[in-house]
Amino acid sequence: MRQAEIKRKTQETDIELAVNLDQQEPVAIETGVGFFDHMLTLFARHSRISLTVKAEGDLWVDSHHTVEDVGIVLGQALRQALGDKAGINRYGTSFVPMDETLGMASLDLSGRSYLVFEADFDNPKLGNFETELVEEFFQALAFNLQMNLHLKILHGKNSHHKAESLFKATGRALREAITINPEIHGVNSTKGLL
């Protein structure tokens, strides 16, 4: 079973997170940051994974530590659940429209961490979520999952739609990448290792 559970406690956050790559329930997100909960729920649904998150953070400061640390723990849990990555597609790409917005995510579960992020948000906050944290979350996720992740808003105006498009596209690209392909024997790399 491709699953993992991680608990991480620091001076700033206390996080319990569990993933299962081969089942879609439960999905239960509690971070104290409403918009972020909404985005993580979308991410889980579109990647078709089970994801539970309980996070307590220093929200009296702002939501930065909570969002970034959830990205760290989610990346670590996904990496652990993937194991040696034998048989997976490895690559995934998705374009997701959201009304006037079109977002793209393309990723490689290569073991090499990199993020290319091309998105601007006119609205600095969505609820108690600072829109600059979209990039911070994906940076933490990419570096801890050890994936190469390219995110881009091709066009759009609404900040909510832009963020939602990127979270959905990343979820859908991840589903493609983590899917076990019967035509792939061993690891999908000429190196024999990811």
Curated annotation (Swiss-Prot):
GO annotations of cellular component type: cytoplasm
Pathways per UniProt: Amino-acid biosynthesis; L-histidine biosynthesis; L-histidine from 5-phospho-alpha-D-ribose 1-diphosphate: step 6/9
Keywords: Amino-acid biosynthesis, Cytoplasm, Histidine biosynthesis, Lyase
Catalytic activity: D-erythro-1-(imidazol-4-yl)glycerol 3-phosphate = 3-(imidazol-4-yl)-2-oxopropyl phosphate + H2O
EC number: 4.2.1.19
PROSITE patterns, alphabetized: IGP_DEHYDRATASE_1, IGP_DEHYDRATASE_2
Keyword Cytoplasm assigned: yes
GO biological process, one term: L-histidine biosynthetic process
Compartmental location: Cytoplasm
A GO term for molecular function: imidazoleglycerol-phosphate dehydratase activity
Pfam families assigned: IGPD
InterPro entries: IGPD_sf, ImidazoleglycerolP_deHydtase, ImidazoleglycerP_deHydtase_CS, Ribosomal_Su5_D2-typ_SF
Superkingdom of the source species: Bacteria
Similarity field: Belongs to the imidazoleglycerol-phosphate dehydratase family.
Protein name per Swiss-Prot or TrEMBL: Imidazoleglycerol-phosphate dehydratase
UniProt organism field: Streptococcus sanguinis (strain SK36)
